Amino acid sequence: MCIRDSVPEYFRSMCYINQRIKETGAEVVINFYELLTGLTYALFRPSVPYVCIGHQYLFLHNHFEFPRKSVIQLSMLRFFTRMTSLRASRRLALSFRKMESDRTERISVVPPLLRREATAMQPEQGNYIHGYMVNSGFADSVEAFHALHPEIPVHFFWDKQDADEVTKVDATLSFHQIDDVKFLNRMAGCRAYASTAGFESICEAMYLGKPVLMVPAHIEQDCNAYDARQAGAGIIGESFDLESLLRFAGTYVPNREFIRWVRSCERQIIGELERLADQHSAVTVPTLTNYFPI
């Protein structure tokens, strides 16, 4: 067997990352919560500064409040997050709201990164519930709600294998295969949104002024949901209790400050990169207009 073939795949990947940093003449590396990048910097110690971006870095912030969950699971989550950012010059923590920087952990809190398609949407007040489920088994609770309230239109997206593009149960209940364009269009026109607590979709719902029911599927989403609830995004449930969502929707007030916060995204992140450039004079700050909402 060739020695190269016996080297673990992840180690070869780190060698490749390190080599690409050298070959491209990169002035700064931006890491979006990728473990191998953190390990590459720990092992090979490239001289090029790097910045880590992700909502998970808020879990390392001294003032972040965690839900009452397993201490072991929370510790493992924090450990993994730290491993992705070993020797990082700066950690940019995407957040639902403003927070002070944590100098000890080299954390700067910045607005969420939303895709331009989401920020360009014009929200409308519709009459249907929009949702996304990771596990198609949750369809049972959605169908149970529908049996009691057939007059309320419900559109859920899922990734169920072998299902049709649209599974139409009847005139007011449909399950759709994932499609980014259709998903955002449904989000913009819905009455309320139900989903597992993925950070990005919660942010999109908040930006579009939609009340949210969050059903966390794992420890990271538990933390997302807890933080989002504090920011006024919505309520947390153990199942897709759509009746509770509709009750909450009746009193929900959109967070206008969140919209302003998101719109300051480019300015905030460019500012952080400029501060990094001041420390490393060779770094040229890139224009991010094509990536961040203005």
Write out the residue ranges for each language-model feature.
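C-terminal amphipathic helix plus adjacent low-complexity
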Residues: 247-294
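Short, polar loop motifs at secondary-structure junctions
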Residues: 33-36, 95-99, 156-165
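Short N-terminal targeting/anchoring amphipathic segment
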Residues: 18-34
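Conserved small/polar residues in nucleotide/adenosyl-binding loops
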Residues: 1-5
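Active-site-proximal region of nucleotide-activated glycan assembly enzymes
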Residues: 44-109
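Donor-nucleotide binding loops and adjacent catalytic segments primarily
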Residues: 109, 113-189
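Nucleotide-sugar donor-binding patch of glycosyltransferase catalytic domains
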Residues: 167-168, 211-255
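A donor-sugar binding/catalytic signature common to diverse glycosyltransferases
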Residues: 28-33, 185-224
